[in-house]
A protein has these predicted regions:
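Sec-dependent signal peptide recognition
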Residues: 1-8
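Intrinsic-disorder/low-complexity, polar/charged segments enriched in Ser/Thr/Lys/Arg/Asp/Glu/Gln
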Residues: 33-37, 88-90, 135-137, 155-157, ...
């Protein structure tokens, strides 16, 4: 999670990281969809204004290259919204870009602004108890319109490679009776390889793709 406080902290620092809630920080638009939505929840005790900004990125990560999406490629609505305390609403995203075999990634930033910052100066209480502006980054993955889901598992070398053109999650659970919480989860983008000693061992191994759990190791069934 990338969470930034932009000045204007109140003197008593009542801020908590749970003030803005957008659910999972990575969300996807499936290959047969041109629309998705993201729920925004105001967990504060007072009203907030929400705004969205979007940047195209080559690949998520510390060295990602950001650029402005082509005009009309990814649209969203509403332009901004105001939520009262405890209220939730959806931002809608519409993909109008190329219909090809390339996966696309967008960094979607949600900006939360206290509505009192827009009130006349005297009503703000002379600058005391100002609240923070918060920006939370998420990743929107638009799967290729011509999708190829494929992988290569090598239990001898302890590797799993994404040989397709769309991302998936890999869940590795030690042994045959462990819980999901005891497992290790990795995101694999096209071309990525994960190496883990547990892949060589008997255990539960799943690929999570399009909200489906796909078992890639039958060792626990023998």
């Amino acid at each position: 999670m990338k969470l930034m406080l932009i000045g204007l902290l109140c003197l008593s620092f009542p801020f908590t990281a749970a003030a803005i809630n957008v659910g999972t920080l990575t969300f996807a638009m499936d290959q047969d969809r041109s629309f998705t939505a993201k729920r925004v929840l105001n967990n504060n005790r007072s009203a907030r204004l929400y705004q969205v900004s979007i940047r195209a990125i080559d690949r998520p990560g510390e060295r990602e290259v950001r650029s402005r999406p082509a005009d009309g490629e990814l649209l969203f609505a509403p332009r901004q919204l105001t939520l009262q305390a405890g209220q939730a609403e959806y931002y809608k995203f519409f993909y109008r870009g190329p219909q090809d075999n390339r996966e696309r990634y967008y960094r979607v930033s949600f900006r939360e602004v206290p509505t009192r910052l827009f009130e006349p100066g005297p009503r703000r209480g002379a600058g005391v108890n100002l609240e923070p502006i918060v920006v939370m980054d998420t990743i929107l993955v638009v799967r290729p319109r011509q999708v190829n889901f494929a992988y290569r598992l090598d239990t001898q070398r302890g590797t799993l490679t994404n040989t397709g053109n769309t991302y998936f999650k890999f869940l590795l659970k030690p042994g045959c009776n462990s819980t999901d919480e005891e497992g290790v989860t990795e995101y694999l983008r096209p071309g990525d390889t994960v190496t883990h000693a547990g892949i060589r061992l008997k255990g539960q191994k799943f690929i999570i793709y399009n909200d489906k759990f796909i078992s890639v190791d039958r060792s626990c069934l023998d």
